[in-house]
């Protein structure tokens, strides 16, 4: 009877299944995935203004960035700016319409408008993503903005 041989085969199979379940996804993500660390994003300045002669508020948020992953340099990427009220309610999400080409270092400005009924204080979060806006490529930047005050 070949019991020891069958048991050994089951043991090898079990080890293979465990490795496949736990380690392959980790290796795959570290090799192929976006980690949110490819780009170092820094705050430059922001404005939350009433536009003269118009019935809207405008939000401008400027960032500088440095790409640490050579595979990301030259690729089309995107970024998202989310605007929240003080209590955390999402007011608006905006992005760069066709994305932009990532240079080794550079800057990117996000601009959007809000109705004049918007609160006078908002919280803004900016993050760079892949072109499809599904995977983060950078750290996020969070700033509280006050109407008619440049930061």
Identify the meaning behind each predicted range.
Residues 4-16:
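Bacterial N-terminal signal peptides that target proteins for export
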Residues 16-25:
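Bacterial N-terminal signal peptides
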Residues 31-55, 148-151:
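Short, compositionally biased P/S/T/A/G/V-rich stretches that sit at domain boundaries
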Residues 52-64:
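Contiguous beta-strand segments within globular domains
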Residues 67-76:
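A short beta-turn/strand-edge loop motif at beta-sheet boundaries
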Residues 89-103, 141-146:
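Solvent-exposed serine/threonine-rich low-complexity stretches and specific carbohydrate-binding patches
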Residues 94-132:
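Short, solvent-exposed, Trp/other aromatic-anchored flexible loops in extracytoplasmic proteins
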Residues 134-151:
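Short beta-strand elements
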């Amino acid at each position: 009877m070949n019991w020891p041989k069958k048991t050994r085969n089951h043991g090898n199979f079990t080890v293979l299944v465990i490795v496949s379940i736990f380690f392959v996804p980790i290796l795959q993500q570290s090799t192929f995935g976006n980690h949110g660390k490819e780009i170092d994003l820094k705050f430059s300045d922001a404005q939350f203004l009433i536009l003269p002669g118009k019935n809207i508020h405008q939000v401008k948020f400027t960032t500088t960035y440095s790409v640490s992953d050579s595979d990301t340099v030259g690729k089309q990427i995107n970024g998202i700016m989310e605007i929240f009220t003080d209590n955390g309610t999402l007011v608006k999400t905006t992005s760069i319409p066709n994305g932009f080409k990532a240079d080794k270092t550079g800057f990117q400005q996000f601009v959007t408008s809000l109705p004049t009924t918007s609160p006078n204080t908002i919280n803004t979060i900016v993050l760079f993503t892949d072109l499809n806006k599904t995977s983060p490529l950078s750290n996020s930047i969070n700033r509280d903005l006050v109407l008619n005050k440049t930061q």
